[in-house]
């Protein structure tokens, strides 16, 4: 077991779309389903909603354009309003045109989905973009942020870092070139990597996808640990529910990941029994946190 293991709960986080339910890609794992559950950034009652729901963090997301970008940069006025009201901001960027890089320092965290092969872009995201161009864009974002830290050493702690996300099994539950994605991440200046899992979702092309096998999960996590030494490994909030979630949580715990987001109740019950209801025992320590995992 990891001696600094965390359970992270996203109760204080509100997901906001900068494009309503509009998306030009209609990705096979989403098909706009997840956009419809997000709050609209143009909603005049958004700040009031954040206060009433006692949120502390906002995930700025939305649908993608044909170039793979999430056009949050068209909504900076509304984003500034949220920030000025004291909320932490995590942003999904996707591909980001260089003329908009300067907006990145406004955020507290930058989440970018990393894929390992052109096949994923074409088959899952319906994205007609060369993966080498996409990777080059991410490397340039990383370089921009590193330069911003160097130029502003007194403010370096306020300059965000990229938090790469990999969705295990995103290719209809099959092997999805996760190792190649991890290899690319090794080139970035990061503190952690977040692993999500494909959720077979009704109304999407992958509604009947099989869940990842534990053996395959072990291969990926162990490869990440050896390829990204010293970097934290988080299990993100995007995971199947029910029995599958419980099995994944226990498997990830056994693999000594650093954190699990929104753990299943059965998993927490068993862990509490193991540690006699006290989340500190011997040299091990299990810490419970609230917020967006990209910021913890």
Residue ranges of each PLM-predicted region?
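P-loop/Walker A phosphate-binding loop and immediately adjacent motor/lid segment at beta-alpha junctions
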Residues: 123-162, 217-218, 225, 231-232, ...
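Hydrophobic faces of well-ordered beta-strands that scaffold small-molecule active sites
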Residues: 14-16, 58, 89-91, 110-112, ...
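Conserved Radical SAM active-site core
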Residues: 32-159, 174-187
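Glycine/Thr-rich phosphate-binding loops of Rossmann-like dinucleotide-binding domains
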Residues: 68-69, 120, 172, 203, ...
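Auxiliary Fe-S-binding modules of radical SAM enzymes
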Residues: 1-6, 10, 47, 182-296
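Conserved strand-turn element in the central/C-terminal portion of the radical SAM core barrel
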Residues: 141-176, 195-210, 232-243
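N-terminal [4Fe-4S]-dependent radical SAM core
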Residues: 1-39, 295-296
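Active-site beta-loop-alpha junctions enriched in small/polar residues
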Residues: 33-35, 63-65, 94-96, 115-117, ...
């Amino acid at each position: 077991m990891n001696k600094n293991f965390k359970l992270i709960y996203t109760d204080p986080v509100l997901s906001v779309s900068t494009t309503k339910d509009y998306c030009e890609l209609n990705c096979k794992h989403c098909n706009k389903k997840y956009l419809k559950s997000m709050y609209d950034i143009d909603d005049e009652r958004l700040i009031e909603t954040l206060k009433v729901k006692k949120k502390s963090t906002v995930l700025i997301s939305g649908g993608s354009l044909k170039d793979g970008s999430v056009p949050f940069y068209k909504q900076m006025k509304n984003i500034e309003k949220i920030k000025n009201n004291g909320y932490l901001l995590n942003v999904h960027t996707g591909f980001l045109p260089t003329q908009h890089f300067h907006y990145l320092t406004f955020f507290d965290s930058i989440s970018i989905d990393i894929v390992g092969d052109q096949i994923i872009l074409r088959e899952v995201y319906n994205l007609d973009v060369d993966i080498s161009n996409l990777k080059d864009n991410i490397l340039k974002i990383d370089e921009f942020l590193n330069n911003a830290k160097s130029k502003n050493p007194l403010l370096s702690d306020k300059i965000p870092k990229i938090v790469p996300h990999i969705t295990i099994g995103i290719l209809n539950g099959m092997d999805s070139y996760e190792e190649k994605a991890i290899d690319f991440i090794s080139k970035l200046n990061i503190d952690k990597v977040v692993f999500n899992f494909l959720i077979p979702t009704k109304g999407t092309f992958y509604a009947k996808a099989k869940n990842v096998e534990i053996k395959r999960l072990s291969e990926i996590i162990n490869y990440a640990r050896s390829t990204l030494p010293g970097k934290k490994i988080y299990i993100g909030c995007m995971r199947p529910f029910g029995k599958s979630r419980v099995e994944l949580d226990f498997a990830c715990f056994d693999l000594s990941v650093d954190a699990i987001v929104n753990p299943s109740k059965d998993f927490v019950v068993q862990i509490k029994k193991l540690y006699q209801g006290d989340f500190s025992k011997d040299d091990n320590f299990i810490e419970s946190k609230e917020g967006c995992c990209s910021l913890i």
